[in-house]
Amino acid sequence: IDVLSRNSTWTLSRDTSLGLNYTGISYYDGQGFMIRKSLKVNSALELNSASICVQTGTTNEQNTSDYFKGNNMKYEVIAFGTADETVKAYESGRCDVFTSDVSQLYAERLKVANPAEHVVLPEVISKEPLGPMVRHGDDQWFDVVKWTLFAMVGAEELGITQKNVDEMAKSDKPELKRAFGTDGNLGEQLGLTKDWVSRIVKAVGNYGESFDRNVGAGSKLGIARGL
């Protein structure tokens, strides 16, 4: 594959030991907790003595330990090797709580038999920076992927959208002229065409449009934008 984009937190060990480079942060996730509404729990601070399903080999294990110890609460960990095993155990009632990154909790909630019977609690107990990864050793491709992400973020800041991209390309504003390649040729430094930013926005939209379509208000997940 050319690009790996998934919920693998950017950590020092992953960045230095896997032969991969993180190209930037495209999404700030964070660990949360999902629980059945029938248990009438409104806050993670009410989870003292709860049993918690967690996937091994993730940052979730250590984060859970730190959070409960820091709040002087007891808990029981029930660990599983894969995400599917963890979710199935939670759904079958083997534990009170399922903990993972909030984005995964929303996604897994859609798969359970009765999604409306489960709630993601408001507390986010960690910061999990996520972003596209590429292989070591191909610096040009690393630059292309990195600056594609930056271009999507910059397009949103400048008000460039899929609908208005052609009109915005006619602007006399210096920053827009540079972005669209009508003043200079930044794309050439990446091995791309002058209109590389326009092509990106036309294909997938700016960062906000992509967020809304895939995980935000325009998706089944309905995750709030946050940062």
Which residues make up each language-model segment?
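Acidic, polar ligand-binding/catalytic clefts
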Residues: I1-E46, V102-S126
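Alpha-to-beta junction loops
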Residues: I1-N7, A50-C53, E91-S100
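Bilobed "Venus flytrap"/periplasmic-binding protein-like clamshell domains
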Residues: T9-W10, Y28-E85, D139
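Extracytoplasmic low-complexity repetitive segments enriched in small/polar residues
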Residues: L12, G93-C95, E156, I200
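Extended ligand-binding regions for polar small-molecule ligands
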Residues: I35-V41, L45, S49-T59, Q104-L105, ...
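Extracellular/periplasmic bilobed ligand-binding domains
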Residues: G81-E117, P132
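Conserved C-terminal helix/tail region of periplasmic/extracytoplasmic solute-binding proteins
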Residues: R213-L227
